[in-house]
UniProtKB/Swiss-Prot annotation:
Gene that encodes it: rpsG
GO BP term, pick one: translation
Name of protein: Small ribosomal subunit protein uS7
InterPro entries associated with the record: Ribosomal_uS7, Ribosomal_uS7_bac/org-type, Ribosomal_uS7_CS, Ribosomal_uS7_dom, Ribosomal_uS7_dom_sf
GO cellular component term of the entry, any: small ribosomal subunit
Biological role stated in the UniProt entry: One of the primary rRNA binding proteins, it binds directly to 16S rRNA where it nucleates assembly of the head domain of the 30S subunit. Is located at the subunit interface close to the decoding center, probably blocks exit of the E-site tRNA.
UniProt keywords, alphabetically: Ribonucleoprotein, Ribosomal protein, RNA-binding, rRNA-binding, tRNA-binding
Species per Swiss-Prot/TrEMBL record: Teredinibacter turnerae (strain ATCC 39867 / T7901)
GO molecular function: rRNA binding; structural constituent of ribosome; tRNA binding
The family this protein is said to belong to: Belongs to the universal ribosomal protein uS7 family.
CDD domains: uS7_Bacteria
Length: 156
């Protein structure tokens, strides 16, 4: 966090197949060790599987899944006196998107299916239907914020 000026956000180029910027960002989250072509293969494979299983536009399912995963509020630790409080704060839109993608990838990797495209497709389908690990994570975060609503006057 620089003191002098705000650093401009880098522009992400849209993905080659669908021309979608959000999907390109998601591929960057899936990518490990800079292997973008592998990440593209995984994401496109997962979207093909989603299309096969649901007979719906895979991008619509993807957007719906992200919307169902993205948290509205989260808790941040704030030290007041000798105590540390979990203070609920609203999540800004860019962080909502980033958290949703991060959780989607994390819970896809923890699934039991054989290949990563199958795991990702399964988690996407579950998330679009308000099920699965990533949606449960969002519910847990919301529950924490609700439980600590009393400390919301300790704003940042």
């Amino acid at each position: 966090m620089p003191r002098r000026r705000v650093v401009a956000k880098r522009e992400v180029l849209p993905d080659p197949k669908f021309g979608n910027v959000t999907l390109a960002k998601f591929m960057n989250h899936v990518m490990i060790s800079g292997k973008k072509s592998v990440a593209e293969r995984i994401v496109y494979g997962a979207l093909d599987l989603v299309k096969e299983k649901l007979n719906k536009d895979p991008l619509e399912v993807f957007d719906e899944a992200l919307e169902n995963i993205a948290p509205l509020v989260e808790v941040k630790s704030r030290r007041v006196g000798g105590a540390t409080y979990q203070v609920p704060v609203e999540v800004r839109p860019s962080r909502r998107e980033a958290l949703a993608m991060r959780w989607l990838v994390e819970y896809s990797r923890n699934r039991g299916e054989k290949s990563m495209p199958q795991r990702l497709a399964g988690e996407l389908i579950d998330a679009s239907q308000n099920k699965g690990g990533a949606v449960k994570k969002r519910e847990d975060v919301h529950r924490m914020a609700e439980a600590n609503k009393a400390f919301s006057h300790f704003r940042f």
